UniProtKB/Swiss-Prot annotation:
GO molecular function, one term: tRNA binding
Record-annotated site: Discriminates between blocked and unblocked aminoacyl-tRNA: 9
Protein name: Peptidyl-tRNA hydrolase
Superkingdom of origin: Bacteria
Length: 189
């Protein structure tokens, strides 16, 4: 079993924020792969399903971004899993918008949701970094991260999320390189 957690803030007013792209990725994966209905569990919302032959628990923490690790740690301990069984989808300022990178281990790089996750489960989990781009000046970061995607970005957002959902089987199989390359090919088309 694997836990795939999408980071974001709960509530409709945050739903379209760039900071919630991890939640969006989980929603698309659940829809494309026919996951079970949402249940309230582990201080958040979960959906169970299969991707290929792998059982996957999708988790959207309801703790707000800065405490995301509490929900992830609780789910990991309940299922007696290791950090290596956890994948976290989140927004990344230091990547161009709609670019995807997979990374295992490392620090938080200023991301409070990742910092919380490290605090609760350690560093050795897989991260799906979803580029949101940097606004240029540090004074504009908060407004950018907590801002909605622009109308002009909607097509790219839908295409990128669809690519994540369509290529999720490679993540389930542990083939991070194939996941990234197939997404890049889909986004170039």
């Amino acid at each position: 079993m694997q836990i795939w957690a999408g980071l974001g803030n709960p509530g409709p007013k945050y739903a379209l924020h760039r900071h919630n792209v991890g939640f969006m990725a989980c929603d698309v994966i659940a829809e494309m792969h026919g996951f079970e209905p949402v249940q309230k569990k582990f201080q958040g919302w979960v959906q169970e399903g299969r991707i290929g032959s792998e059982k996957v628990l999708l988790l959207k923490p309801g703790t707000f971004m800065n405490e995301s690790g509490r929900a992830i740690g609780e789910a990991m301990r309940f299922y007696k899993l290791e950090p290596q069984d956890v994948t976290v989808f989140y927004d990344e300022l230091d990547l161009e918008p709609f670019k995807i990178k997979v990374k295992r281990g490392g620090g938080a790089a200023g991301h409070n949701g990742i910092r919380s996750t490290i605090r609760h489960i350690g560093e050795d989990f897989r991260r799906i970094r979803i580029g949101i781009g940097h606004p240029g000046h540090k004074d504009r970061v908060t407004g950018h991260v907590l801002g909605n995607y622009a109308k002009a970005e909607q097509d790219d957002l839908v295409q990128m999320l669809g690519a994540i959902g369509a290529e999720a089987e490679w993540l389930a199989k542990g083939d991070d390189a194939r996941f990234m390359s197939d997404i890049a090919l889909r986004l170039q088309a």
